[in-house]
């Protein structure tokens, strides 16, 4: 039957039986894959040559690898060609010429077979006994799980005990408040330490007039810097530091030798509230303190629009409660510590030193009035100077042809 052809292999056939046999051949399947990939087919001779080359490579891979060792030079090679090149090399010839030989023989090659790599995946029959694996019973599995859970529990308990020990060590950590935070220089008194830190490092305490516990404040700041490696100004906003030197270099480079206090951040201010006492500054327009003290006859009394005083009278005693505004909640929550006379003397001396050094402190009423008068005088002087400047900004010697 004429016209029987294969478009993939470019072959013509005499009958259908020959064509069907061709369709079952590997050569036709290979050309079909090439046709699907958009690549032209190959001839039968080229396909057979490729198949024979692949078979030779497979046989070589199946053969056991050999190791060729030169007894004179003590060198090993995986192929015979590399071993022959070594025998013709200059180093080998020099050793042979120098007379280094074994039992009078110059060229001795030790050829041995290398061990094959162990193949983990082997051909296993479906019905072989190696497929079957013994499985532990439910009781053994439960016992293993219980032992694992107990071991994990013991590990967690030991870890928690170590954490408790670390917390105990942190509580026992003591610090000398008379030691400088930046250079570890010791001083005899708190006052000399504060003056040193301000003079050499630019550190000062804000609102020192209301400070009630200077020793506690310096101890707390020292623990933050020397134990927790934390910047006094950045606090937790900055990346954590690994050592004390890193914290000190950061504070010196960024000029952070100061407290982040009084900038309007309630969280930062609440951290240092317990060391301050602002009760003396709570005054109204008439100069009276907002906090009410004393007994009153009325059961409920509104005081100054900021507090509500409630009194309860009994036969022997009289109790009173004060309800304040939310604006002063942060001050009501204070728990002031008992202050000693020594701390008051230190605060007074430090405030006087700060004033002598030119640092800003809380101004008095007279100073505020003077500042207002100075500002008004400076404003009036500026207006007068501008008027005089406008009038004098005229060219008086004009030429004759200018009428104005």
Curated annotation (Swiss-Prot):
It holds the Pfam family zf-C2H2_2. GO terms for cellular component: cytoplasm. It is found in: Cytoplasm. Residues 125-147, 160-169 have a biased composition (Acidic residues). The keyword Zinc-finger applies. Keywords: Cytoplasm, Metal-binding, Repeat, Ribosome biogenesis, Zinc, Zinc-finger. A zinc finger (C2H2-type) spans 4-28, 68-92, 178-201, 229-256. Disruption phenotype: No visible phenotype under normal growth conditions. When grown at 10 degrees Celsius, the double mutant seedlings reil1-1 and reil2-1 show growth arrest at two cotyledon stage and die. One of its GO terms (biological process) is ribosomal large subunit biogenesis. GO terms for molecular function: nucleic acid binding; zinc ion binding. Residues 119-169 are annotated as: Disordered. The keyword Zinc-finger applies. Belongs to the REI1 family. Pre-60S-associated factor involved in the cytoplasmic maturation of the 60S subunit. Involved in the dissociation and recycling of other late pre-60S factors before newly synthesized large ribosomal subunits enter translation. Can complement the growth defect of a yeast mutant lacking REI1. Required for leaf growth under cold temperature conditions. PANTHER family: CYTOPLASMIC 60S SUBUNIT BIOGENESIS FACTOR ZNF622, ZINC FINGER PROTEIN 622. Can form homodimer. Interacts with RLP24, RPL24A, RPL24B, EBP1 and JJJ1. This is Cytoplasmic 60S subunit biogenesis factor REI1 homolog 1.
């Amino acid at each position: 039957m004429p016209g029987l052809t294969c478009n993939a292999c470019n072959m013509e056939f005499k009958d259908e039986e020959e064509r069907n046999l061709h369709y079952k051949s590997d050569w036709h399947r290979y050309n079909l894959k090439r046709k699907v990939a958009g690549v032209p087919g190959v001839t039968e001779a080229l396909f057979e040559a490729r198949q024979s080359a692949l078979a030779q490579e497979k046989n070589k891979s199946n053969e056991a690898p050999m190791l060729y060792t030169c007894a004179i030079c003590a060198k090993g090679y995986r192929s015979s060609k590399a071993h022959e090149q070594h025998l013709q090399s200059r180093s080998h010839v020099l050793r042979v010429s120098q007379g280094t030989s074994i039992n009078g023989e110059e060229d001795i090659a030790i050829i041995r077979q290398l061990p094959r790599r162990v193949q983990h995946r082997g051909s296993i029959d479906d019905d072989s006994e190696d497929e079957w694996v013994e499985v532990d019973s439910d009781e053994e599995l439960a016992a293993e799980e219980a032992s694992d859970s107990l071991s994990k529990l013991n590990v967690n308990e030991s870890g928690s005990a170590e954490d408790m020990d670390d917390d105990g060590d942190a509580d026992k950590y003591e610090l000398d408040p008379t030691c400088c935070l930046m250079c570890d220089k010791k001083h005899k008194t708190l006052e000399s330490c504060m003056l040193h830190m301000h003079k050499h490092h630019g550190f000062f305490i804000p609102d020192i007039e209301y400070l009630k516990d200077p020793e506690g404040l310096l101890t707390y700041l020292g623990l933050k810097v020397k134990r927790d490696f934390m910047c006094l100004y950045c606090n937790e906003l900055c990346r954590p530091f690994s050592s004390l030197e890193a914290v000190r270099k950061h504070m010196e480079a960024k000029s952070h030798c100061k407290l982040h206090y009084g900038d309007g951040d309630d969280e930062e201010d609440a951290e240092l509230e317990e060391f301050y006492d602002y009760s003396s500054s709570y005054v109204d327009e008439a100069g009276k303190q907002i906090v009410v003290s004393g007994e009153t006859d009325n059961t409920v009394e509104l005081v100054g629009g900021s507090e509500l005083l409630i009194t309860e009278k009994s036969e022997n005693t009289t109790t009173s409660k004060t309800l304040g505004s939310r604006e002063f909640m942060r001050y009501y929550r204070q728990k002031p510590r008992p202050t000693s006379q020594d701390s008051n003397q230190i605060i007074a001396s430090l405030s006087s030193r700060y004033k002598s050094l030119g640092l800003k402190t809380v101004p008095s009423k007279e100073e505020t009035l003077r500042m207002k008068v100075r500002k008004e005088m400076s404003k009036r002087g500026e207006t007068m100077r501008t008027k005089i400047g406008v009038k004098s900004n005229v060219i008086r010697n004009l030429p004759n042809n200018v009428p104005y």
